Amino acid sequence: TNEQEISIALSAGVDSTLILSLLRKTKPDVKINAISIKFANSVDETPAASKIAEKYNADHHIIHLENYLSELPKAISIIKLPFWDLHWYYVVKKSQTMSKTLLSGDGGDELFAGYTFRYKKFLSLTSDNSSPIEKVRAYLECHERDRVPDQESIFNQKCEFSWDSIYSILLPFFDNNLSR
């Protein structure tokens, strides 16, 4: 691996594109390896990712996955838990052959204006007069597609799950003038 090179997981989405553009702006001379996954029988974002990589002068590496689950046992043995985003196993494996640094836009949707459908729903559920706790509840309702069915009965027994504790964690983010 080369310490002068940086790898980035590139999905062609807003988040990874923004990270790549900022990386190129701040490190104009560094060699960047952009890594994308092409899944068999799925929507293919790699042509768009290739254009983005070219625009920001990054070498684009496409991993073709015919059998997404072929390395599942190995990935679980490393992480010690089942992991939803199994593609990371393949991205990290490829990145390790090229550099010691891997960047991604993972988790940036809320920071970089992704998931606009959630913002529209949040605004439809709240008003300028909504209390902070009402805003927290509306925010969680916007994420209902991420919930596990019967999560209260499942998690309550395993980890003392409590909606009140979730609300108290999120409350500071909605008890301000920026949350509407």
Predicted regions and their residues:
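ATP-dependent adenylate-handling active sites, centered on carboxylate activation for C-N bond formation
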Residues: 1-180
